[in-house]
Structures are given as C-alpha cells and as structure tokens.
C-alpha cells in the first residue's frame, strides 16, 4: 500500500496560534474550567420568535457535555432524528451553557419536561423556521478564574475596559486546530494532494508531537498492520478509524483519505485558512496596525459583512481619513484579513505583502488558493471584535477565592481570545 517509501519527518510548519498580543501584559497565572459552573455561557438571540409554526424552539441548559451528546439526548427525548434539530452555535463542553435549539414537530405537542442530570429545558416557543448555524447575536460569558491573586483585579478591570475601547484581536484559538494543534498541517497536505503525507501525519509518528500513550497505535500503522491499528482508536476517533478501515481493505492512500467524512476534511481546510488569518493578525499586532487602516486594506462592515477598499488616496485625504476613523471608533468597520480561497478578495498595496507572507508561513503560495474547486471558497474576517458589558470582580465560594470576569462577544468570537489578552497565555485550562 505504501505509495511513499520514506517515513522521514515532513517539513516543519510553525504554530498556527498568534504569538503577539495587544496588551503585551506580564502573565497572570490562574486556572479556569475546574468545574462547569466556573465557565458560564449564555447565547444571545438574533430575533424574536412568533409563537406559532412547525418548529418548537427550546431554551436549553447544558452542563458538562459535548454538543453531539446534547443533540442525541434531545432527539431521543422528543422521538425525532438528530437532523430535525437546529442550533445556532456549539458551546464548550466544560461549561454551563444556555442556548436555543429548534425541534421540527409538525402537528405534535411541545416537548414534555426533560429529567436529565446534564440537560434541562428552560422554556419552549414555536416558530415557522428551523434555527440555523450562525443565527445568534453573540454570547455572554461569565468566567471564574481560580488560583489567582485578588489583588490583580485593578489591572484586569483596566485591561478589560481597554479591550472594550480598542476591540479584541479576533484570533482563532487552539480549539480551531485540534488537540495536536496540527489541523492546519492536515489541511495543507490536502491542498498539496499529498495523500501519504496526510496519512502519516494523521496516523503515524513522524509528524506533529502526539500524546505518549498513542505510540503503540502509531507504530502499528507504520508496520502496515491497519486492522490491528483500528482497535487502538476509540469509536470517537472517527477520521482515524475510517482511514484505517479503508487501508485494511486495500485502498490507496488517496482513497483512504477520501473515506474520511467530508465534514472532517472541511474542518482541516478551515484550520489552514485560520492559521493564515492568524499570521496576518500577528503581523498587524507586531506593527501596531491591528486597529487602524493601512493602504490597500479591505474594510469589513460588522453589520452585514460587506467589504470595501481603503486606498492610499483615502488615507491621504484628511476628511476621508477622519471619516474612516470615526467609523472605526464606533466599531462600524474594522480592518480584515483573508480566509484564503478562490472566492476571497485580496488586499492591495501595503496590505497584500502581509497576506502573501502569511501564505508563505504555511509553505504554500497564493496560486494554491485560486483553484475554483478549493473549499471553503474563502471570505474576509475582521481583525478585531467588539467586547461589551465588561465586568471584573473578586469573589469567594465554597471552593475558595476567585476572580470573575464577564463580557459579551459577537457570534464567531472566542472567549479564549479575551483570556489570552488578560492573562498573557498563563491561564491553565483544567479538564480540557
């Protein structure tokens, strides 16, 4: 089966995470997610419900379980297929999250009360349409940080309000790249159609570091003992098991990769796009241009997502530059960076070299993203997000002292981006 005789380590691709921050503060060591009640998330609705229709929207409180587990529990309770359930976003497992789901129940009564230790139905109301991914205004977070000195409250309070004025760097966090932080590498290998290299990275031991306890299963792969290797991977390791099953049946490397669900391959392609975005953002943070325009930028309108070019002549014109600054200060617009693909509009002038540098950072060229068959097709993403309703206070409960930070973020934004700025990356995520 081996279509590549070499098992030598592949080209080393740098970290996909941002290496610079806006606040550049000295680290504050603390711990989050010691228990679900330390990480509260409340979904903010995008629209009002009408009160009638085939879809029952339910308010759910989810405690310490994964999104797929939530969907299965609700589907079984209501006697429907998981496909009949809609949701706006996926919430962190290690949290108490309040969110909406929709359940297609035409001509049927509303769901009865749910008696489950991890899922509670808070309310029900009917609507004509299914809830779709992205149909939320944002999320409200309340996070308790433990093992931290309460004396740091003034600094945290000051930094939170600075972030509310400047915006938060809109970085993709670790969860975007998988537990080995190699999702972008797998995406790159898909772009290059390096099928054997992809399998070596996913299943072997010559690429990105992996947990010590995975050595046996990865060595078994290198011995071409694919059927035996399957037994080492858990049922939840869907991609690994699918590829190994295909290999055990004599599939080529390409066929084994294509045996993996398209949704999983899309995840890795999105991770590649995210790594490129983070690299552009990193350069802008380093140059102190993350929250203002440079020549050739594409301005992103937060209401609606439209973009327009910011030319050198606009920045040189005092009146136009002042208007841009007013709109920036009001969080109406922000600079943007590409989620690279054939459908994306690229920057120009001073902005384009930064975007090309980011593509080179993952050892690719712009040409790789011009293929019309490339998916996802690409878009622009703002370099910053608005943080509203900031709060910081010290507290104590039966588990000891804590610092509580709270804030609202728009949809698609990560609370980890805020924590990274506030604590300088020294926060410890327990149970993650």
What are these model-predicted stretches?
Residues 2-51, 55, 63-65, 77-398, ...:
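Extended, charged/glycine-rich binding lobes that contact polyanionic ligands
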Residues 67-72, 415, 419:
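Ser/Thr-Pro-rich, acidic low-complexity intrinsically disordered regions of eukaryotic RNA-binding
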């Amino acid at each position: 089966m081996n279509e590549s005789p070499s098992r030598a380590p592949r080209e080393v691709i740098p970290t996909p995470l941002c290496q610079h921050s806006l606040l550049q503060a000295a680290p504050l060591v603390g711990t989050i997610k010691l228990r679900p009640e330390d990480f509260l998330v409340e979904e903010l609705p995008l629209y009002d419900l009408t009160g009638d229709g085939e879809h029952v929207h339910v308010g759910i409180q989810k405690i310490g379980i994964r999104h797929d587990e939530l969907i299965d529990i609700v589907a079984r309770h209501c006697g429907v297929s998981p496909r009949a359930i809609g949701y706006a976003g996926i919430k962190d497992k290690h949290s108490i999250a309040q969110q909406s789901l929709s359940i297609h129940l035409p001509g049927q009564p509303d769901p009865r009360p749910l008696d489950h230790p991890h899922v509670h139905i808070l309310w029900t109301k009917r609507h004509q349409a299914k809830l779709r991914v992205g149909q939320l205004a944002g999320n409200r977070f309340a996070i308790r940080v433990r093992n931290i000195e309460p004396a740091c409250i003034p600094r945290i309070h000051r930094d939170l309000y600075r972030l509310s004025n400047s915006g938060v760097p809109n970085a993709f966090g670790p969860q975007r790249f998988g537990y080995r932080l190699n999702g972008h590498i797998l995406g790159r290998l898909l772009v290059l159609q390096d099928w054997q290299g992809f399998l070596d990275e996913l299943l072997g031991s010559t690429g990105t570091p992996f947990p010590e306890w995975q050595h046996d299963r990865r060595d078994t792969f290198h011995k071409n003992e694919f059927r035996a290797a399957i037994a080492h991977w858990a049922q939840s390791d869907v991609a690994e098991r699918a590829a190994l099953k295909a290999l055990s049946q004599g599939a080529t490397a390409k066929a084994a990769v294509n045996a993996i669900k398209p949704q999983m391959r899309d995840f890795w392609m999105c991770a590649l796009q995210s790594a490129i975005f983070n690299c552009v953002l990193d350069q802008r943070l380093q140059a102190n241009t993350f929250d203002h325009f440079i020549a050739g930028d594409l301005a992103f309108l937060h209401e609606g997502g439209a973009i327009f070019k910011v030319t050198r002549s606009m920045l040189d014109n005092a009146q136009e530059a002042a208007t841009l600054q007013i709109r920036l200060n009001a969080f109406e617009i922000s600079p943007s960076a590409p989620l690279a693909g054939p459908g994306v509009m690229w920057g120009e002038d001073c902005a384009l070299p930064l975007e090309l540098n980011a593509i080179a950072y993952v050892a690719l060229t712009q040409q790789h993203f011009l293929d019309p068959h490339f998916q996802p097709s690409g878009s622009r993403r703002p370099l910053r997000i608005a943080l509203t309703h900031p709060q910081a206070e010290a507290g104590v409960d039966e588990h000891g002292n804590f610092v509580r930070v709270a804030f609202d973020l728009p949809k698609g934004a990560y609370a980890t981006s805020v924590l990274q700025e506030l604590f300088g990356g020294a926060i410890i995520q327990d149970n993650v």
